Amino acid sequence: MIPGDMGLRVTADNRPRMAVRRHGSGPDVVLFHGGMGSWRHWTRNIDALATRFTVHALDHPSYGDSATVARETTGSVYLDLVHRVFVEMFPGDAPLRLAGFSFGGAIATSLARRLAPRVTHLCLVSPGGFASRRFGDRPIRSYKEAGNDERLFREICRHNLLVNMLSDPANVTEEAVDIQADGVRRTRFDSRKVSGGGTLLGDLAQLTCRVRLLWGERDDSAFRPPIS
């Protein structure tokens, strides 16, 4: 499907510091995934974007194919690390467009502030980074509940997708469950350290680029603006 360009500096465990899949040609668009995810969160978007842009779909550190950070890494240190690796991957002053979902929204906004004026556009989908990342009474199930039961693990993946990301059961396909299961298994950093870190509003206030914020029609995030 999408070729894996893994031409990055690697760590002792032979993983890229921040893995990337590249596709298409044109101006650069960089995609940042959500918590317990990977570049595959953007599976349905990459081909469409690649008709106009060079798409760079990342695995954040400690996610997917990327190298692992220390367990005690704080949210602020994590954002600093991503920034250092990112400028190695994208040196120079060429314009950048960034898009981030949830956890990735907080990362993308932090980078947009640090890299201004290189970042010309920022698109955020139900972004994290508010001071509190609580979702009321969402009945999320723990993946630990499954133990070694693969069937139960996939059932929990399906349940949590409907609670957190997809409102229509018809959209929770086997492919969607595969993506969720793979992301959960390869998550090695607690995204809540960033998603609940309170950096988003301060970062947004300093931006001069074009910003678009999107929430799903049934997104119950406390930070979603009311529908008029």
Language model: regions and residue ranges:
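Flexible "cap/lid" loop of the alpha/beta hydrolase fold
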Residues: 109-113, 120-151
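Active-site loop/oxyanion-hole signature of alpha/beta-hydrolase fold enzymes
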Residues: 11-13, 56-100
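Conserved HGGG/HGGXW glycine-rich cap/lid loop of the alpha/beta-hydrolase fold
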Residues: 16-65
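Conserved loop-alpha-helix segment in the C-terminal half of the alpha/beta-hydrolase fold
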Residues: 215-228
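Conserved catalytic-core motifs of eukaryotic protein kinase domains, centered on the activation segment
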Residues: 41-43, 66-72, 133-136, 224-226
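Gly/Ala-rich beta-loop-alpha elbow adjacent to hydrolase catalytic centers
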Residues: 100, 104, 108
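Conserved alpha/beta-hydrolase catalytic His-Asp/Glu region
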Residues: 151-209
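N-terminal cap/lid segment of alpha/beta-hydrolase-fold proteins
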Residues: 1-17
